[in-house]
């Protein structure tokens, strides 16, 4: 009897194990099916994103070409202040179009658009000076070297951008200045208070590199801003039309407004941010974010010129390329506590 009972128990145990093994099969199959469906959905989403980017690129090109032609026509026949103001308004629209398209445009197309916009802005400034007799006389007496130094062909009937550059006041080259060009900024300085004004910055690329214990104030609307190899610096900048880049910085405090912020190899830095898209950090630690609070008398005008939407601020929407876990916050960046945001900028 005991042997029969043991045999029956063994059979029951074997049946239970077989049933458990069989129950695992559907779970594995279900898991594989879920993974397969997720992969299919990812590929589908990727195709859709590519199609959307392609459509957006076509829309950008068509809109930009149409608006550029309209501005060129206004500038060619600019005989009144009203027509110039209409051209200025359309140029602001083009600036906003570029800002809104920065994420899906190829780098070459983006640069071409920015250069075309810069030429049109220079042509507008030239036409405005053309309505003033004194400025017209100064333009006629300018040497041939300035007119012949352009490297980019302007639109038909529109003066090349370099003429506007040569005819406008340029910053004096101080110690540590990078010199007048499309790029301006400071480098290799320590324990200095550095400033640039709107007339020096407008739609130019700003490069700040190898600064230590410096305070930098940029009053105006640059096109891009790059800060590299800075230590214990304070940087205050007006609205930047496109991107701000930080690399290899430490123990800094920044106030910046921009379309996109990218931070690389930086640590222990506080950033007071206005960003219309998002911030991206990579190989960073100890980064703290808070809303942009710096202000100066002409900042509203500079925001309008930049094309940034001041009502939109994603200062706490940050992507960490070194932290892919969605269910846990990145340890590399955090929100600056409110009690620590009271900064005396000036």
Curated annotation (Swiss-Prot):
Tissue: Expressed in the retina. Expressed in the rod and cone photoreceptors, extending from the inner segments (IS), through the outer nuclear layer (ONL) and into the synapses in the outer plexiform layer (OPL). Strongly expressed to the photoreceptor connecting cilium at the tips of the IS (at protein level).
Keyword line: Acetylation, Chaperone, Cytoplasm, Phosphoprotein
Gene3D superfamilies, alphabetized: 2.160.20.70, Tubulin Binding Cofactor C, N-terminal domain
InterPro entries, sorted: C-CAP_CF_C-like, CAP/MinC_C, CARP_motif, TBCC, TBCC_N, TBCC_N_sf, Tubulin-bd_cofactor_C_dom
Modified residues (N-acetylmethionine): 1
Predominant location: cytoplasm
GO biological process, one term: protein folding
Residues bearing the modification Phosphoserine: 80, 168
Subcellular location: Cytoplasm
Region described as Disordered: 1-26, 140-171
Subunit note: Supercomplex made of cofactors A to E. Cofactors A and D function by capturing and stabilizing tubulin in a quasi-native conformation. Cofactor E binds to the cofactor D-tubulin complex; interaction with cofactor C then causes the release of tubulin polypeptides that are committed to the native state.
Function as written in the Swiss-Prot or TrEMBL entry: Tubulin-folding protein; involved in the final step of the tubulin folding pathway.
Family, as annotated: Belongs to the TBCC family.
Name of the protein described by the UniProt record: Tubulin-specific chaperone C
Species of the source: Homo sapiens (Human)
